[in-house]
Curated annotation (Swiss-Prot):
PTM-bearing positions, type N6-(pyridoxal phosphate)lysine: K242
Pathway assigned in UniProt: Cofactor biosynthesis; methanofuran biosynthesis; Cofactor biosynthesis; coenzyme A biosynthesis
InterPro entries according to UniProt: GrpII_AminoAcid_Decarb, MfnA, PyrdxlP-dep_de-COase, PyrdxlP-dep_Trfase, PyrdxlP-dep_Trfase_major, PyrdxlP-dep_Trfase_small
Stated name of the protein: Probable L-tyrosine/L-aspartate decarboxylase
Keyword Acyltransferase: no
Domain of life: Archaea
Gene that encodes it: mfnA
Gene3D superfamilies: Aspartate Aminotransferase, domain 1 (3.90.1150.10), Type I PLP-dependent aspartate aminotransferase-like (Major domain) (3.40.640.10)
Enzyme class: lyase
Required cofactor names: pyridoxal 5'-phosphate
């Protein structure tokens, strides 16, 4: 650290230089994040100092968090929604704002583990959860952090979890199941209703990772059952900083009832509240303000238009790609497309090296993974496909 302070001009000159190293979203077809809405940015700045880790000091930011959770609960068909106020939830469905899907997934599984061990069930055993092979890598972190075995169920031909496979993995030490509503690689929605039946029959918890799909599925033309309408669902992860167009970090975790939320409680004797239910202590009140602002500003109609736009791009990409002989692995469920191309790893490398396109690769099978986000345009799609054709022709 320098002894004497630098001038603002020097600092911001350096910051501008460094920022130029970041990739402009214009050439990004791999990220599930995008530019936050301008109103979210403005609201974020207004509450930049607010710390939701000390609710008594930042009652206004806390009020916004409660309102965001209420709106998310309505979106996910919760009957009534509240976040903890002090020691307990004030009504049936509880939740709080997280840093994103990883934290939400960790906390959901932590809650499962706490509940079964507090009740004296399965104590001393190596507990396990059953997740799809398509589950996010955050569940590997769960295994490492909590000493829980993560069993991976195989996928069906449409890349949804195979229910028979999931059922075969359940044993006496299984504490919960996980379903994905908009998985990262394929954009597919697992059969949550069937997982719910399996969970209820075996007295297991069921967590739904809708980090990406939570702001997409409710606005698709085709309906999917994935949320609290499904009786066995006990918790849901949803990320406003993805298709919700909020600022980073803005995630959320919702529980069906205080029973699940209470399992996360720790005492905080030196703060303005007696307890916390969160993983992190300090939390961004600015993210709560940003999410509140953009959800109120756009409303359901605005989000519906946002999803329609992305799905129009998705349809265009698939239609035009087929003209060049590139078929999708599956017909896209949402704004994620996986294209069958020869030597996808080499194609990905050449697309970046020669044309600056950022795309990614699915693991099994290997294919070119593309995410169509609000920052993309029809012109982007046309340019990308021309460049893709050039790269594959040269192989």
């Amino acid at each position: 650290m320098n002894e004497q302070g630098l001038s603002e001009k020097e600092i911001f000159s350096y910051l501008e230089d460094v920022k130029s190293e970041d990739t402009d979203y214009y050439r990004v077809l791999s990220s599930m994040c995008t530019h936050p809405h301008r109103i979210a940015v403005e609201a974020h700045r207004l509450f930049i100092e607010a710390n939701l880790g000390d609710l008594g000091l930042f009652a206004g930011a806390h009020r916004l968090e409660k309102e965001v959770i209420r709106m998310l609960g309505e979106l996910l068909h919760a009957q009534s929604v509240e976040i903890p106020s002090g020691e307990a939830c004030e009504s049936s469905v509880c939740g709080y704002l997280t840093t994103g899907g990883t934290e939400s997934n960790i906390q959901a599984i932590r809650g499962m583990k706490n509940l079964v061990t507090e009740d004296g069930k399965k104590s001393g055993e190596i507990l396990n959860i059953v997740v799809p092979e398509s589950a996010h890598f955050s569940f590997d972190k769960v295994a490492n952090m909590m000493g829980i075995e993560v069993k991976r169920a195989s996928l069906d031909p449409e890349f949804r979890v195979d229910i028979a496979s999931a059922e075969s993995l359940i044993d006496a030490n299984t504490i919960g199941l996980v379903g994905i509503a908009g998985n990262t690689e394929f954009g597919q929605v697992d059969p949550i209703e069937e997982l719910s039946k399996l969970a209820l029959e075996n007295e297991l918890f069921l967590h739904v990772d809708a980090a990406f799909g939570g702001f997409v599925i409710p606005f698709l033309e085709k309906p999917y059952s994935f949320d609290f309408k499904v009786p066995g669902v006990t918790s849901i992860a949803i990320d406003p900083h993805k298709m919700g167009l909020s600022t980073i970090p803005s995630g959320a975790l919702l529980f069906r009832s205080p029973f699940f939320m209470d399992s996360l409680k720790v005492n905080t004797p030196y703060l303005t509240t007696k307890s916390q239910f969160t993983l992190t202590g300090t939390r961004s009140g600015a993210s709560a303000a940003a999410t509140y602002a953009v959800m109120k500003y756009l409303g359901r109609e605005g989000y519906r238009k946002n999803v329609q736009y992305c799905m129009q791009l998705t349809t265009k990409l698939v239609k035009e790609a087929r003209k060049f002989g590139f078929e999708p692995l599956i017909e896209p469920v949402m704004n994620v497309v996986d294209l069958r191309v020869p030597n996808p790893d080499i194609v990905r490398e050449q697309l970046l090296k020669k044309f600056g396109w950022n795309v990614s690769i699915t693991r099994n099978p290997r294919s070119l993974r593309l995410v169509l986000m609000p920052h993309n345009t029809a012109r982007d799609i046309e340019e990308f496909l021309q460049d893709l054709r050039k790269v594959t022709t040269e192989l």
